[in-house]
Amino acid sequence: MRIAALDQGTTSTRVLVASQDGSADIQLALRHQQHHPQSGWVEHDPLELLANLQRCLEASGRVDAIGLANQGESCMAWDARSGEPLSPLIVWQDNRTTPHIERLRASGAEALVVERSGLPLDAYFSASKLGWIVEHLPAARRALKAGRLRLGTSDAWFLDRLCGTFATDVTTASRTALMNLAEGRWDPELCALFGVPIECLPEIRDTVGHFGVIGNTPLTASVVDQQASLYGHGCRQPGDAKITFGTGAFALTLSGERIIRSPETGLLATIAWQIDGKPVYAMDGGVYDASAAVEWPGVLACSATSRNWPASTGRRPSTAAWPSSRPCRDSHARTGTAAPARCGWEWTPAPAARTSARPCSKAWCCAAPR
């Protein structure tokens, strides 16, 4: 038996093929463009992601089953009839809805959101992004009026286009702030609060099941990438935990059959997976910019100064080589890093990275309890 594991992530799409003997090999990995039309906005082209997924499927060869891991909170709109995108994929890092989130918080809405979804009010989650799409994009409003609007996270669009199935799994739905965590269904009050038409959202399913076929091959699992990592690392018992270091860094700890709410520490209640209708819960703590926070040297490599660095000597220019040695901040990196903090998720500016050439600090960091 050969199984293709598709991982559609924030910066790349890859496919790993696992065989019955336990061997596993990455067959193909493809990077995609990051779009920043305004400061704090982060978008992907859904058609580029879909094309990369299809190329990965072709590279996997003949397999017996397919699994799909997705970005989680990244979301979009599309036409139910044509399948064409009506919006870009708004990435989880995107913070365009922060003013709206602040207004909701000032109105006292956070208590309801935390109680129902397990998540705090934050632009990170899908709810406010989907509401923004409905409010600001004319194509989405026209589709809504015509009864053709579909809204969802990236997995729902991939499943719709690849399998003809308009569905999402419960782990992904739990990251939207629109799902009632205890009941595993879309919450009408939360949808109304964020301005998201509940009838436009996908069916919520178990993590493992029949999601349709791609060609003649069944897609039998769909899950958020971080939860996939938790399961893949063999975590099964309450207290088992893992930390994944990628674009962001995310810690997940299993809590088993119990939903553990710990708002005073900033840890979020979520679902790790659900099989045969039985949910397994977890606690989540995340840092939005981990490897993303140190990608700026790659950008600097494009500068004339960087191109002229003598590679053979290993020398680096001093800060005097730069027009200003004062630290600056990348205007496209205002997503910030978030981490569990004693009274919620706190945000404080990070000092410039200490390198011999220190032109900017890409990320923000958070004060965590000691």
Where are these regions (language model features)?
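Short, acidic/turn-prone active-site loops that include or flank metal/cofactor-
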Residues: 30, 35, 90-97, 247-249
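Short beta-strand-loop/turn "lid" adjacent to the catalytic site in phosphate-handling enzymes
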Residues: 58, 62-92, 117-126, 155, ...
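Short linear loop/turn motifs
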Residues: 201-210, 310-313
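Active-site core segments that coordinate phosphate-bearing ligands/cofactors
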Residues: 3-6, 98, 105-117, 124-167, ...
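N-terminal glycine/serine-rich phosphate-binding loop of ATP-dependent small-molecule kinases
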Residues: 1-87, 115, 206, 216-221
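Short active-site oxyanion
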Residues: 64, 88-89, 143-148, 199-203, ...
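Residue-level signal for inorganic ion chemistry
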Residues: 22, 45, 66, 94, ...
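Short, function-defining helix-loop hinge/capping sites that tune catalysis or transport
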Residues: 15, 53, 77-78, 87, ...
